[in-house]
Amino acid sequence: MSSNGSLTKDEVVNIIKDWNFSWSIIFLLITIVLQYGYPSRSMMVYVFKMFILWLLWPASMALSIFSAIYPISLSSQIISGILAAICAVMWLAYFVQSIRLFMRTGSWWSFNPESNCLLNVPIGGTTVVRPLVEDSTSVTAVVNDGHLKMAGMHFGRCDYDRLPMEITVAKPSVLIALKMVKRQSYGTNSGVAIFHRYKAGNYRRPTIIQDEELALLRA
C-alpha cells in the first residue's frame, strides 16, 4: 500500500487474481443452475435453483436494510429504505400465496418461488405433485414402457391402461380440473393422452382413495 493509503497496481492485480478463481466457480454454478435448473431436465438441480431463489429475498432485504442503516448519503439511505420496504412487501405476498396454495394441496411444492401452479396427478393410490412452470388449458401425458411424463416432467411408473381420467392444476385462488379427452396407444404399455380443462372452482384438491395394492407396488 502506498503512503497515501491507496492500493498499488501490484496489490490490485493480486486482489483480482485472488477473487478471479472464486468468481469463476460462482459463475460456473450460476450457469449450470440457469441452464439445467428445470424440472424436465434435472430435479436435483431444479431444487437447488429454488433454494437459491428462496434465499434471494431475505438477502436482498438484509442488504437494503444495512444500506439504510449505514448510508453513503441521504439519497442512498432513502432509496435503500424504499427497496427494503418493497422487498418486505413482495416477500410477504409470496408467503401469503404459498400458504394459500399449501392449504389447497398439502404439498411443499407450494413454496416454490418460481411458480404458483401445481400439477396433481393421481397414480397408484397416491397423488404425485409437480410444479407447473407454464399454465395451459391442456396437458399431454406420454407413457413410454410404463413410465409417465406430463408437461415434460417425470411422474414415475404408471401403466398406460391405468392413466387417471382426471387431473387437477392448483393455484392459490382456484383449482382447475382437466379430464382426458383423447388417448392413443402406440406400443406395449405405451401411449399418449390429452387432458383438457373442463371446470374450475374454489375448492381443495380431491382426496385420493388409496389403492393399497398399487401403493405397495410403487413403494
Swiss-Prot record:
It is a multi-pass membrane protein. PROSITE patterns: COV_M (PS51927). Residues 40-49, 100-219 are intravirion. The keyword Transmembrane applies. Keywords: Glycoprotein, Host Golgi apparatus, Host membrane, Host-virus interaction, Membrane, Transmembrane, Transmembrane helix, Viral envelope protein, Viral immunoevasion, Viral matrix protein, Virion. The keyword Transmembrane applies. The chain crosses the membrane at residues 19-39, 50-70, 79-99. It is found in: Virion membrane; Host Golgi apparatus membrane. GO terms for cellular component: host cell Golgi membrane; membrane; viral envelope; virion membrane. InterPro entries: M_CoV, M_MERS-like-CoV. Residues 1-18, 71-78 are virion surface. Homomultimer. Interacts with envelope E protein in the budding compartment of the host cell, which is located between endoplasmic reticulum and the Golgi complex. Forms a complex with HE and S proteins. Interacts with nucleocapsid N protein. This interaction probably participates in RNA packaging into the virus. Component of the viral envelope that plays a central role in virus morphogenesis and assembly via its interactions with other viral proteins. Belongs to the betacoronaviruses M protein family. HAMAP family: BETA_CORONA_M. This is Membrane protein. It comes from Bat coronavirus HKU4.
